[in-house]
Amino acid sequence: MKYPIGLQSFEDIRKSKFLYIDKTDMIYNLTRDGKYYFLSRPRRFGKSLLVSTLEAYFSGKKELFAGLAIDSLEKEWASYPVLHLDLNTDNYKTEGALELRLTLAITQWESIYGRYELEKTLSQRFEGVIERAYKKTGKQVVILVDEYDKPLLQAIGNNELQADYRGLLKSVYGALKSQDRYIRFALLTGVTKFGKVSVFSDLNNLQDLSMDEEYQALCGVTQDELETIFAEPIKQLATKYKLSVEEALCRLKERYDGYHFVENGIGIYNPFSLLNTFKRLQFGSYWFETGTPTYLVELLKQDNYRLPNLTKEVSTADVLNCIDTASNNPIPVLYQSGYLTIKSFDEEFGEYRLGFPNKEVEEGFTRFLLPYYTGLRNPETPFSMGEFVRDLRSGRPEDFMQRMATLFADTNYKIVGNSELYFQNAFYLIAKMMGFYTKVERTTSNGRMDLTIETNDYIYIVEFKLDGSADVALQQIDEKGYAQPFAMDKRQLFKIGVNFSLEKRCIDKWLIA
């Protein structure tokens, strides 16, 4: 089986006989149900391949679809002029970058369909290209825009540049409305959907597929597709890891499944991670290896967001579906970017509860944020966390606390915010990382407790005070009965009282009992 890792050309995949998961029945329905569409999905989720497939279909390349579902559905195989704008190729952090990219694309189309010199602005030239493409071919035009939002995302934090980009894109996309009679089909894809002063505000007939139940599996891999198409590599993976097929499926589900794009929808697997897993026959964090956008940190910084709330967020469809550039709320971006997903839906109130989709995202996002909030630098993070965990597994609470104190003392405070929030966020990330290797709990039934860590041989109960006293923290462990649930447990139990100085932004004292 040839895996199309990194390949986004439908034609190349089909001609070179790479694996293609057949979504063409949905594509056929899509081209008949409506005219103007928008789809947001996380990066590396197959959006570019979808656009390429549509380009091949509307170009009438019937031979590429032999044996696929659409082969028996489509009878005409007409060819239409296709204008494909790919905004994923450039860097848009400098003024003029977007205008140059649009100019190059329109100039290329004009070389095919001609240009009138009186058309001066990009929007006028785009309108002219659409009209002339129709008149030259006698066929309505298909417009495909891939990663429409990349310029806007790269301009987060630069309000002036983002406003310029938004205005430019709005004027260009406005051509779709003015030239409607010449257009057969249009699809715009991206990671996010920007609202308020939207680039789509003139396109009031744009159908959003992002939370459409019928098309929830248009990108990504379903459980049925996984078990039928990848049956053989799943067996190979199970053999390598000495697992049963059922156990291998469970591990794949834990690591790569869990994306839900509609209420009560089916789980969708990240295709990029699955393909890499089967290609290498190794469980890994492949989605994060391709890079995590720094604009996420910018948003978290601007909002002074409390990271422990990440898995407690409740939101509505209106909020999730639309990003307001005037707002610092990071949740819509985190959801649309694939770092959070729908976990449950309250039908009565129309509210979605969010959380991490799977272990790959949860662990990868935690590792990504750790250097921004603590003294753990990126290259050293795996080693440093290993030392933390080895201390815990070996029953060395003093060494563990020494490392903890050093970690806070070394922090370079890339994230600006009040000291209490800084401590809570840093401590949350550290506890989260340790939780991937040990059992970590942050609450009890009798009230709030900062941290309980369990290994095979030891139990640690840690109470933190902010500008308080390590003695009082230790005393509170007994008063609140935090150790009571472990009264019959044979493992050695350590109680640790810790004080964090908000002024110094460091751990200034701890006591162990």
PLM features: residue spans?
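Phosphate-binding site recognition
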Residues: 1-419, 434
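Short, mixed charged/polar active-site loops
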Residues: 448, 459, 506
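Conserved catalytic cores of phosphodiester-cleaving nucleases, focusing on short active-site segments
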Residues: 427, 451-466, 480
